């Protein structure tokens, strides 16, 4: 059972009565065949549900209206099997508030060269029916996704599946509640922002809860529940001597388990799926939540430190998008650099809170070590290195008049040396196209020091996310050149300025 099982995507066929009942009967048969095949063979994350043909303005409007009010409907896939005059779609598309994908396909893959006649031509008109539909989208200034390819093509399946992930993520985001335990880290700019504007743009709500409210729930957790969770720790992780049953830091592990159970109960009771903490506001907690946060992220919760609600929300959104995909997704921070000619590296980490979903080790190390920041007892944490391979880091920032998504494509590498004195999980990567270009572009674009790191998602996923939410995206990859990048920032400023 995954979040995708809670949603479905409606498959809508556009046609008209001009061609007669026999043609419409064949269109319906083709649609049933295609939907059944896609549900069976395409490995789509969501079920496709075939809706009645849209052959009149009233029928199309009814489908779009019903989609809006059906909470299970994540979006619409539209196929213009025959020519479907696009004025019929205006009212429906005007009111539609669910994501829309135009599947530019046709039932047959090859033309029947010896038998093709006008009946065949009239039945299979995607080539120009799709263009008519595209015009009305452009005329109405409504962005929608387009996938071209035969319905049996695996690449088309993958693209539809990727779009479905975005559509479900968007519906989940509309119901997302972000809990901030405490406020923003004092005097920090980029982690702050306009929460009302965010709720208007994305749908998620952000509210603050006193740490004392959390502490009450933490203190209500029974010793039996704590011991049961620590037994789980024993089976899942490599425990250092200090954390084992007679170790000198065993009590810190028990307290970390109590915090995890209390946090999870608080989040579940409030319907929260993302949260933040700050080391400046830990009143009543015996340690900064480290292990608890790591494990909650692995369970799908969004998180960011220092009150950074935008990154916490983005992490949850990306967790939903990547459900079931290979590779993990985590809160991250660009921490420090390794400058070496031709081998510049970024070491990413945070004080404690890196998600084990990106761990290279099957059993991370569970340890308790000193943490000066926060002024509390030594916190428990998981320590691990990160899987190697292509990845991305993404940052969502508030520019006042709009949101900007920054994405840097990176290549994670194996740590060339052991890190015996580094008591936190970490990731090591090469930034594309190189560290000087990537860091300068990131700084010029205003990217945050907090990011979401993902092996599971790629640049195309984030482009789709930006398009679906109608926000700016700024990309730093192997094709980035600083002069052109600066020009793009200037052009974007003008473009979005005109749209205000």
From Swiss-Prot:
Question: What Enzyme Commission number does this protein have?
Answer: 5.3.1.4
Q: What UniProt keywords are attached to this protein's entry?
A: Arabinose catabolism, Carbohydrate metabolism, Isomerase, Manganese, Metal-binding
Q: Where does Mn(2+) bind?
A: 306, 333, 350, 450
User: Which top EC class applies here?
Assistant: isomerase
Q: Which GO terms describe its molecular function?
A: L-arabinose isomerase activity; manganese ion binding
User: What is this enzyme's catalytic activity, as reactions?
Assistant: beta-L-arabinopyranose = L-ribulose
Give GO BP annotations, semicolon-separated.
arabinose catabolic process; L-arabinose catabolic process to xylulose 5-phosphate
| Pathway annotation | Carbohydrate degradation; L-arabinose degradation via L-ribulose; D-xylulose 5-phosphate from L-arabinose (bacterial route): step 1/3
Q: Cross-referenced InterPro entries, in alphabetical order?
A: Ara_Isoase_C, AraA_central, AraA_N, AraA_N_sf, Fuc/Ara_isomerase_C, Fucose_isomerase_N/cen_sf, Lara_isomerase
* Protein family according to the UniProt entry: Belongs to the arabinose isomerase family.
Which protein is depicted?
L-arabinose isomerase
List the top taxonomic levels of the source. Answer: Bacteria, Pseudomonadati, Pseudomonadota, Gammaproteobacteria, Enterobacterales
């Amino acid at each position: 059972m995954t979040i995708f099982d809670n949603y479905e995507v409606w498959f809508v066929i556009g046609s008209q009565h001009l061609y007669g009942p026999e043609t419409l009967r064949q269109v319906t048969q083709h649609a049933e065949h295609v939907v059944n095949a896609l549900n069976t063979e395409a490995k789509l994350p969501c079920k496709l549900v075939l809706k009645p043909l849209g052959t009149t303005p009233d029928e199309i409007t009814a489908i779009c209206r019903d989609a809006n009010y059906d909470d299970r409907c994540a979006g619409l896939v539209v196929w213009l099997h025959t020519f479907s005059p696009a004025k019929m779609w205006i009212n429906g598309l005007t009111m539609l508030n669910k994501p829309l994908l135009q599947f530019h396909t046709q039932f047959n893959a090859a033309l029947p060269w010896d038998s093709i006649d006008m009946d065949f031509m009239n039945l299979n008109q995607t080539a120009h029916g799709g263009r008519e539909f595209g015009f009305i989208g452009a005329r109405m200034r409504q962005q929608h996704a387009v996938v071209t390819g035969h319905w049996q093509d695996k690449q088309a399946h993958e693209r539809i599946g990727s779009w479905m992930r975005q559509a479900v993520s968007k519906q989940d985001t509309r119901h997302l509640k972000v809990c901030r335990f405490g406020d923003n880290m004092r005097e920090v700019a980029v982690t702050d922002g306009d929460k009302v504007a965010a709720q208007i743009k994305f749908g998620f709500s952000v509210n603050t809860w006193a740490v004392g409210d959390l502490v009450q729930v933490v203190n209500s957790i029974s010793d039996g529940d704590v011991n049961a969770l620590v037994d789980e720790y024993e089976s899942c992780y490599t425990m250092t001597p200090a954390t084992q049953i007679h170790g000198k830091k065993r009590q810190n592990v028990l307290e970390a388990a109590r915090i995890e159970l209390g946090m999870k109960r608080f989040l579940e009771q409030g319907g929260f799926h993302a949260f933040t903490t700050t080391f400046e506001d830990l009143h009543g907690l015996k340690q900064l939540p480290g292990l608890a946060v790591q494990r909650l992220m692995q369970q799908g919760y969004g998180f960011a430190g220092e009150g950074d609600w935008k990154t916490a929300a983005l992490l949850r959104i990306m967790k939903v998008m990547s459900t079931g995909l290979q590779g993990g997704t985590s809160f991250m921070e660009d921490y420090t650099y390794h400058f070496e000619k031709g081998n510049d590296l970024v070491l990413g980490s945070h004080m404690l809170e890196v998600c084990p979903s990106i761990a290279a080790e099957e059993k991370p190390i569970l340890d308790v070590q000193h943490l000066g920041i926060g002024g509390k007892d030594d916190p428990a944490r998981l320590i691990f290195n990160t899987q190697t391979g292509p990845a991305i880091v993404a940052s969502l920032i508030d520019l006042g008049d709009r949101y900007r998504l920054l994405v840097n494509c990176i290549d994670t590498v194996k740590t060339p040396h052991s890190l015996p004195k580094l008591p936190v999980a970490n990731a090591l990567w090469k930034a594309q196209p190189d560290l000087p270009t990537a860091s300068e572009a990131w700084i010029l674009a205003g990217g945050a020091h907090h990011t979401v790191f993902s092996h599971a998602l790629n640049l195309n996923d984030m482009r789709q996310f930006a398009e679906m939410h109608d926000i700016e995206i700024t990309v730093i990859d192997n094709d980035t050149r600083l002069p052109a990048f600066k020009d793009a920032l200037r052009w974007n400023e003008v473009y979005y300025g005109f749209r205000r």
